[in-house]
Amino acid sequence: MNTPATQVNRLAAGMVGLGMIFDETYRPFFEAVRQQPLYDPAFGICQVDLAAVASRTGRRADAYRSAGKLGDFESFKEPDAMGQLLKARDLNFVCVATPDDRHFAASKAVLEAGKHLLVEKPSVLSLAELDELDRLARQNDVLAKVVYHKLLDPDHKKLRTLVHDGQLQHVNNGYCTLLEPKLISGEQFSEWIRGRNPGTYVAVHYIKLIDFTFGGRLVQVSCTGQRGIVGPADGDTWDSTQLRLIYRYDSGRDACFDIHTSWVTPNNFPGYVEQEVQFRFDNGVWNGHSRKRGVECTIEDQTPFNVKISINNHYNAPVVEPWGERAQRGYGIEVIERFAREVAHVEYGGPAEERSKRLEAARSLHYNDVSADRQVVAAVHAMEAILAKHAAGQPGAVVDVDAPEGGLVLRLPGVAEPEVLYSGRVAAK
């Protein structure tokens, strides 16, 4: 009889979207786990196979399959790539890495099919959509998780540890910035960039970092931005955004966080992105610069275009190990492995009759479960609405959270009647 230590279990994975994020994080994970399966004393050996992918044209899928490092997966392209993927194979989980305004439809289909879900941030763009995903996950007894890889950044882990252990006491305010190059808005994401903003795409990293690390209750959201480079100066496509969040804590005190994002940094910038955080506490200050971590490299005729001068070896680093193995490691890949381990533990981590207990234990992990994503999505929902008003000629809106009128209440200067964006309560009761 097989024991957990020798039994080989299997998870079949589906992938929706084969763009930049897939190449940087999912591809390295699936390649590595194909060579070295997951192992844990609770679930034994677990082989994870990329079984099927859905994409718009199928061209990238053909190239990856030809390379031979991901196995012989099935590839489905439009029309109805998603429907074909879910019908063709008996998948255990599906990863969704599409443009952010397409997350909901794909994620909903995955959960309706009874598959575990991992979706890129932001999970969805509205609280009503989040409610639906959470409902479907519970109804069908599967996990619904979100990729927040910055929580696994070793610097951010240390920040949270100092807060968790009470060494850094009561955050007062914070500033975060993440500036993407023009390559993102002008080339890599050009097919879906119209009508979008960099705040939803990248500020959400720091919304989650703030929400998860410091706790508290989100009470107000405001936002402004600039246009004219990616799209018309009077259009609805944004070059940069400045988001402000107000949180309130059990002490009755507030904290203010400003998050500045853009995707119009010159392509010859020394780092792939510019990113930093600063948080002030009652008894200290945390400064973290995620680009300038001490490594600079110049290579003639390579930097700063093909190779960047400042290298983030924590996120995603292709390396040759001292023992000769070529590998790709980093927190961007680790977060996907963590999800696969959670699924393996739910399905194979003990007796079948105790699966529901294991499922609830996995759902209680607030760093990535959709049930813990309410305040993050509330901020995204509010930001989207504020920027839409701004683009329509009504700047300066503020959204109050869990106000007397509703969960998300948008107020415009000079307009007496507020607009209720979401009637339910945002904060957990």
List each language-model region with its residue ranges.
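Predominantly a Rossmann-like dinucleotide-binding segment in NAD(P)-dependent oxidoreductases
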Residues: K150-D236, S356, P395
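Active-site beta-strand termini and strand-to-loop segments that position acidic
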Residues: D236-D254, F279-D282
